[in-house]
Amino acid sequence: MASKKPIFVLNGPNLNLLGTREPEQYGHQTLSDIEQDCRARAEAHGYGLEFRQSNHEGELVDWLHDANETASAVVLNAGALTHTSLALGDAVRAIEVPVVEVHISNVHARETVRHHSHISAPAAGIIVGFGTMGYGLAIDAIARWTET
Ligand code: DQA
C-alpha cells in the first residue's frame, strides 16, 4: 500500500513567540506544544507531520511550493502576512494541494486591517477563533476529507 504523504503545518511571523506573545489573544501554549498536539492528531489519522515556522515571506512561499510535491494537505497560519501578502495568496492559488487557513484568534473581532485575508479565497477551508485547538481541528478536517 502506498504510504500517505505527510500533512504540512506552516506558521508565519512571530508565531515562534507563542506562549509569551500577547497571551490574552493567543493563549499560553507554545509552538512546540502545538506541534506535539498536531503530531499526535496526524499520527492518529495515519499521517506523518512536517511542522515549520518562518519569519520570512519567501521561505513560506517556497514551502508551499514544496508542499505541492510532497504533502497531502497544508495547514497554514501565515500570521500578519495573511493580511498583507499577495505573494502568499498567489502561492496558495498556484498549488493543487488543499490549504486550510488557521487563525488562533478571531481576526474578525479585531482591528479592521485583520479582516481581510489574501489566503481565504484560494483556501480549501478556514478555521478562525478556536484558539490553538484550531490546528487540530484542521488536521481532523483534512483526515475526514481524504477518507471520503
Ligand atoms: C494570527 C492573526 C494575525 O492577525 C496575527 O498577525 C498573527 C496571528 C492568529 O493566529 O490569530 O500573527 O494569524
What function would you assign to each model-found segment?
Residues 13-15, 79-82, 105-107:
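Short glycine-rich anion-binding loops that position phosphate/pyrophosphate groups of nucleotides
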Residues 48-58:
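Short beta->alpha junction loops
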Residues 93-110:
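Short, acidic/small-residue loops that bind anionic groups at enzyme active sites
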